[in-house]
Structure formats: structure tokens, C-alpha cells
């Protein structure tokens, strides 16, 4: 490619509305342009990276035995009604009607479509297992699109779906996809971890996320210092404290706290250790519980894990916090004064709360708190459950080592769906015994466009992007100084350009009539890994300058050795 025949579209200024570095650099490097909220046009440089990612994904899917298909983005509503997700999915599912008043959705995922397809195509256990994949546009009507393509409404995704007659067969494919995903992200030179995860709205049993480690990540992921345990913080179990509850040393007393409506204010004003306080959170109760609200107790320095709480049978799904009006109607006090003593609601305490003594909590009277609360003496110990997020230093759930926490960007997710979709949609085959058998399913997703942003979050400096070779828009940039005035500079540049292309190298020749500083800045910004600078002065000694974008060091290479040198440097 020649810059004179290419849309480079680089920008010097950082866009004001770009929050994270990947969004900033994708705009500045001319990779994307915003069309509307959460909608982006991919420009040539962005498309080149996107295609590199796609190709790696496709190669490894083929190597893992998956078969490529292509399914419509527009899906009939009756499939979603049949699966039960028409009501469950929520406002992220964009629904519309066609001119015949028939309801449809823009697909955020394709479980229903693939299940409908396979139940009509497969009829015998002898045809299984099968694994199908596609690389297709998805749409989720995010309430707050942000971070550029990281959380866009329209995005490119690789989704795969496998069908089986036994759990053993599903596990075999699941393991193969786990291995394939590891190969995909390793080929892209990404620093990633596979972590245990919640299945979320997709459903199913076992699940792993593939997280690219980055400070800008939206997810907290936890690792054990003593084993290979790794999980999303939403999934990680907080073990019960091993120390027994300390005996009571304080009397129960009620204290005026008119200016303490939060745990932080209570701690500051009364010099209480925060680990001696309890937060009381009211959420909607499950309709079969016979109550409107249920109280959840967590220690003052801990955060409620909403995923864990939502799984409790006493709690309504989706988890919904009570409004101040609902709280006052039920308790007679505001949310800043709630506590478990004399509370006429079902109560569930976190494991760490169950071993507390002499603690403080709201008195269910505005402007008042109880101090010196003790279980069994002042109130009965309620139902106890794991309700909180783990924190650094907690014992690992496998009992080996302690936990550390890092930020991550989810780029892949694999699930063992079981019969969640196939059973309700009656996707059956004739089993070995001649009877109909519901197929068991797995599903496996990679956010292809999100991978591009995640790679930038890990690979950049103050001058721009530093692409890994495998997904760089161009592997080599040829920068000829004053080629329009120097015949020998132009001659070598053209010769090198032709030779590298013949070796299958993605190369860009900057043949613009631009100042050297502009040429250097643009190639650094778009992140070309290997740069060759050709100048008259160096040609006097039959040399060119090579600069590695990641290392930053320059070295002189003999003109006769350039091609061989570059082929040895490029990871292919």
C-alpha cells in the first residue's frame, strides 16, 4: 500500500469525548469515526486490524473442528418468545416490527437461531457432535455506550455453538475451545488470563471468561498466589472466616447520629473501625417469599456482590434495590439509618457479618444508630450466605494462597449451556436407544472488535499504538526521505516495497511529499512495528536505518541485507 493511494486520516489532537486510551488512539490513528452513540464506521486502517484478528480467530476455529455458517442479524420475535428470553433479556434487546406488523429483534446473540436451525437439520445422535461458528455483527442497545468500540451498541463478534448427546462430549468440545481461545490470544501476543465466571443472561452451568489485563478494564479479576485459581470477582467465593466470633465486651446502646447517613460519615464522626460496622441493604423479595423486601447485611468495608445476591431464592430477579419511598413505607426510616435490630423483614447476613461482635448499625430510626450489637444476645443470627465481593488478602476459594485483584477487559467467554435452550425449543435427536433425546449445547464467544481496543490498551505509549506483529495494519513502513528529489532513494524504496510484497509482507510505502517529522509521527501513531528509513546520506555507505516501534532503538542495516533482516524480525 502507498500512502498516496490510501486514506490515512490521522489526527494530532486528542478528542475531548474519548475516555480511554484505546478510544483516543483509534480516533487519532484514523481507525474509526463515530456515526452515532455506540455506532462506528471502520476506516481502512481499522479494517486491516479487524481482518487480521478475524483471520486468526477463523484459523483457530477451523483447527478446532468448528464449521463456519452465517446467520441473519434480524431475528423473528417468536424464537425469542419460545426460548423465554423475550421477557428476560431487557431493554438491551432492540425490538421492532416490519411493514406487516410482524415483530423482530436485532440479534445480540444467536442461541435461538442456531437451535432452530439444528433442530430442523439434525435428527440422529450419529450426526453429533457438531460445532458451528460465525463472525457476525451484533447489536445490543446499551443504556450508556462508552469507551469507543469497547462498549459499543453495534459490534463484531465470533460466536460458536456446539451440539452433543452427552455431557462428556460437551466437555471435550468445551476443552477444545478453551485451548483454541488460548491459542488465539497467544498468537496476538496479548497478556490474558482465563478465569471462572458467572453465566449471566446466557445461562448454563460451567463458564470461563478470557480477560486481557489492563488498568482500564471494567472487570475485577482475582488470582491466587498459591495456585492457578482465577475468577471474575462476580464469581469468586468469599470463604467464611476461620476465626470464631469474639465474645461481647460492650453493652447495646442507641446513639444520636444526625449527620451520619453513610458508613464513611459514621466511621469519621465516631472513630469506629469500619470493620466494626454493618451495612443494611433492602432489595425486592421474590414473590413466593410472602414479603415485599428482604434485608442483606454486609460488613461496612465490604461490597455487596449483586450476582451472588440475585441467585438467592429469597431475592427477586433481576436484583432491584428498594427506593427510599419503599424503605420509608416499610421501616419508617431512611436508607442511611437501617440495621438488623428489631427489623421486621427477612434478613440474610454475609458470612463475615455472622462472626462480628460489638458492631454498629442503623437503629431503623432517622438519625440514630445502635452500637455494641451482638448476635444471640441482641438479636437472633439470621440466614447466613456468601454475599460479598472478595478483597485482596482473602484466602483463595481453593484454600491455596491468598487472592490478588487486577483489572481486565473481557474479550472471550465460553459456556456449557446444557439443555437450557434445546429443551424449551424441543431440539431433539434420536438417541442410541431409539428414543428422542434433548441435545446438550455449548456456546463460545469472542468480541472481535473489542479485541482490537483491548490490544491497544496493552500496547501503546505517548506517541501512539504499538501493535503486535500478528495484528498490525502494516508490518513494515518504508519511509524514504525526499524520494521525489533523489532518484536512488526512490529506486531503493520501490525495489524494497516490491520485494517485501512478494514475500507476503504487509508493507506501506510513505510516498507523500511530507516533512520527515510528519511521516515518522504518523507511522508511530498507527503503530507499524518495523520501520525502514531511507536517506541519501546513509546510502553513501549503502545502509538504511531500521527502527523497532516497540523497542525504540535504531540500527543501521546494509542495503543488501534489509529483506533478510526484516524477515528475521517479523513474527509470522
Swiss-Prot record:
It comes from Yersinia pestis (strain Pestoides F). The keyword Transport does not apply. The keyword Aminoacyl-tRNA synthetase applies. One of its GO terms (biological process) is prolyl-tRNA aminoacylation. This is Proline--tRNA ligase. It catalyses: tRNA(Pro) + L-proline + ATP = L-prolyl-tRNA(Pro) + AMP + diphosphate. SUPFAM superfamilies: Class II aaRS ABD-related, Class II aaRS and biotin synthetases, YbaK/ProRS associated domain. Keywords: Aminoacyl-tRNA synthetase, ATP-binding, Cytoplasm, Ligase, Nucleotide-binding, Protein biosynthesis. It comes from the Bacteria. One of its GO terms (cellular component) is cytosol. It is an enzyme of class 6 (ligase). Homodimer.
Amino acid at each position: 500500500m502507498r500512502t498516496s493511494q490510501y486514506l490515512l486520516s490521522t489526527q494530532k489532537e486528542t478528542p475531548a469525548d474519548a475516555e480511554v486510551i484505546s478510544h483516543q488512539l483509534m480516533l487519532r490513528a484514523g481507525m474509526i469515526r463515530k456515526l452515532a452513540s455506540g455506532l462506528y464506521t471502520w476506516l481502512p486502517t481499522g479494517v486491516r486490524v479487524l481482518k487480521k484478528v478475524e483471520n486468526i480467530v477463523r484459523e483457530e476455529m477451523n483447527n478446532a473442528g468448528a464449521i463456519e455458517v452465517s446467520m441473519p442479524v434480524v431475528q423473528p420475535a417468536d424464537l425469542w418468545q419460545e426460548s423465554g428470553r423475550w421477557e428476560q433479556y431487557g431493554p438491551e434487546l432492540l425490538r421492532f416490527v416490519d411493514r406487516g406488523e410482524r415483530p423482530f429483534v436485532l440479534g445480540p446473540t444467536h442461541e435461538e437461531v442456531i437451535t432452530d436451525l439444528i433442530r430442523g437439520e439434525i435428527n440422529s445422535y450419529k450426526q453429533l457432535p457438531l460445532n458451528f461458528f460465525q463472525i457476525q455483527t451484533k447489536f445490543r442497545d446499551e443504556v450508556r455506550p462508552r469507551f469507543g468500540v469497547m462498549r459499543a451498541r453495534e459490534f463484531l463478534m465470533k460466536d460458536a455453538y456446539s451440539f452433543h448427546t452427552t455431557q462428556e462430549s460437551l466437555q471435550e468440545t468445551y476443552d477444545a475451545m478453551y485451548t483454541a481461545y488460548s491459542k488465539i490470544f497467544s498468537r496476538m501476543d496479548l497478556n490474558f488470563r482465563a478465569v471462572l465466571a458467572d453465566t449471566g443472561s446466557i445461562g448454563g452451568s460451567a463458564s470461563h471468561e478470557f480477560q486481557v489485563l489492563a488498568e482500564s478494564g471494567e472487570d475485577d479479576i482475582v488470582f491466587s498466589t498459591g495456585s492457578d485459581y482465577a475468577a471474575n470477582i462476580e464469581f469468586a467465593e468469599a470463604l467464611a472466616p476461620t476465626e470464631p466470633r469474639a465474645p461481647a465486651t460492650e453493652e447495646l446502646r442507641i446513639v444520636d447520629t444526625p449527620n451520619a447517613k453513610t458508613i464513611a460519615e459514621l466511621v469519621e464522626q465516631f472513630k469506629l473501625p469500619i470493620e466494626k460496622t454493618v451495612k443494611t441493604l433492602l432489595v425486592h423479595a421474590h414473590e413466593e417469599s410472602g414479603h415485599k423486601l428482604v434485608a442483606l447485611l454486609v460488613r461496612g468495608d465490604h461490597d455487596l456482590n449483586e450476582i451472588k445476591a440475585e441467585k438467592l431464592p429469597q431475592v427477586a430477579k433481576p436484583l432491584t434495590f428498594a427506593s427510599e419511598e419503599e424503605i420509608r413505607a416499610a421501616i419508617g426510616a431512611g436508607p442511611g439509618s437501617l440495621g438488623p435490630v428489631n427489623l421486621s423483614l427477612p434478613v440474610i447476613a454475609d458470612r463475615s457479618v455472622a462472626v462480628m461482635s460489638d458492631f454498629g448499625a442503623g437503629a431503623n430510626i432517622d438519625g440514630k444508630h445502635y452500637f455494641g450489637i451482638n448476635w444471640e444476645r441482641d438479636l437472633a443470627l439470621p440466614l447466613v450466605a456468601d454475599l460479598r465481593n472478595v478483597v485482596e488478602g482473602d484466602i483463595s476459594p481453593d484454600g491455596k494462597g491468598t487472592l490478588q485483584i487486577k483489572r481486565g477487559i473481557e474479550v472471550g467467554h465460553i459456556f456449557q449451556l446444557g439443555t437450557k435452550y434445546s429443551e424449551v425449543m424441543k431440539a431433539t435427536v434420536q438417541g442410541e436407544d431409539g428414543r428422542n433425546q434433548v441435545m446438550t449445547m455449548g456456546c463460545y464467544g469472542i468480541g472481535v472488535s473489542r479485541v482490537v481496543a483491548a490490544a491497544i490498551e496493552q500496547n501503546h505509549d505517548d506517541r501512539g499504538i504499538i501493535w503486535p506483529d500478528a495484528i498490525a495494519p502494516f508490518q513494515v513502513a518504508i519511509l524514504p526521505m525526499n524520494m521525489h528529489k533523489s532518484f536512488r532513494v526512490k529506486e531503493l524504496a520501490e525495489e524494497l516495497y516490491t520485494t517485501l510484497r512478494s514475500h507476503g509482507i504487509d508493507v506501506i510505502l510513505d510516498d507523500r511529499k511530507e516533512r520527515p517529522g510528519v511521516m515518522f509521527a504518523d507511522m508511530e501513531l498507527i503503530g507499524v512495528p518495523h520501520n525502514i528509513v531511507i536517506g541519501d546520506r546513509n546510502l553513501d555507505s549503502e545502509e538504511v536505518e531500521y527502527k523497532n516501534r516497540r523497542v525504540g532503538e535504531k540500527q543501521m542495516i546494509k542495503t543488501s541485507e534489509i529483506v533478510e533482516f526484516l524477515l528475521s524480525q517479523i513474527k509470522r
